[in-house]
């Protein structure tokens, strides 16, 4: 049977959900093919969304019309701001989720969205015509034709689950791997490599002894992810902290020879920032304990996820390890930990629109691109969906810059540098992180969302008013010169503030940590009518004014540099500071400008600086 749509999405995980929903929202006919409809939106690993860097991604996805934020706000069990004591640039919202509620909400959202149809089957191969994808075939002899195809297969491509010496061809425990599609992608000439990730054991909630464990509460004023969320008052459950100990470590050491990670059974590279417990014991042998979080998987608290105990050790060893830990001495394991090895395609095979360079109309998103994490997958799925629709409409792709969004950083890192380990987002990856805060996501991306038809006009108008109010009042504060007069000193004293000794503008005064929103309104009467969202932005902009201005200068400098032309017969060979790889790629593609050079995978900002210098030197000589 042959069926037709505008866009096909393969895979119903976090990337596939965002890709299919956003494309349907933008008015094209979308068909989602997934192995199991009931696992759409399943959180395969930890029961949480957000975190450092990841919270930024979730909020960016939300502003650009994505679903992850709103689903999380409907299914959260505990909400916290991580790094709350640090500056706003590095804070991250994180929520424990009810995995059942999240999955059901996501599935129903997909099933009830106009322009979006779903079928339960397995994609086996791509249909190509003149190096352009035109559809797929499935395991039940269906043929789907479409103008664009987005592949979001997660860990299912030639997936192998490892528990001790046992191996099974699964994409997730108990679910079939996608071997035919994996073979098809290899045959098409993509650069396919292997990665590994893992998950932690789960234990029955009624078998845990919580007495003596440290209770971990949510925030008193819980933060939420979606700007569309109203009247937010979630039920908050506690997590609990426990630790491994020397006995735990000895049990693991005694069984290193049975660990797939060390026996040579696993060849794929695992996530650097989420290592298995056996890897931690091996690499940090001097540590006497490792922190573990017991996290409820649902509101019923029937199962707890042991965060920090990712493992692929044999079943009997997992039993001994868990029973050696305080609070888990009599724990009943409901699901064992396991490692999974899977195919991914080097993301240097992609453009910044997430379209493959080899095959026109084919987009990749999520773990197939070498990333790890629900949020990273959602961000890529969203962008692939948007760009597939724009390509259908013969419009320019939507590319976010590194100075605009963490999504821009994520995609730029992937397509220019590639990866040899599962890539996850951190605030440290963003060189412009002072500009890319969670608190200003709406102001950063609202205009893009509105232009793409993904934000309501009335809301956007209010947002623009707020943005104008921020700019006007910052200008007014800069022009407001304060002197240590009797009146000024008296007012500062009444507010419990230290006196000023010299002239100072309003921005410098508000840079003080102690100057909260209430004091701002009290001292500067023109700030009284402003809403809290505007005041908060003014406060942050004042506090980091010098650094923010510096980052804007750097961006302007970079934008100016990228406009520099590269002479037609410019010789790249022999330039100190350019790697052999960079020289080979520059000679091969012969970019006409530094901007074109920046689009070549493997060309770094440092390479561009060197090129800029030598273009200037050779012009002058």
Swiss-Prot record:
What are the annotated GO cellular component locations?
cytosol
Q: Tell me which Pfam families the record gives.
A: GIDA, GIDA_C_1st, SAM_GIDA_C
What processes in GO biological process is this protein linked to? tRNA methylation; tRNA wobble uridine modification
Q: Which GO terms describe its molecular function?
A: flavin adenine dinucleotide binding
For this UniProt record, give its keywords in alphabetical order, as a comma-separated list. Cytoplasm, FAD, Flavoprotein, NAD, tRNA processing
Asked whether the keyword Flavoprotein is assigned, the reply is yes
Q: Which NCBIfam families match?
A: mnmG_gidA (TIGR00136)
The molecule here is called tRNA uridine 5-carboxymethylaminomethyl modification enzyme MnmG
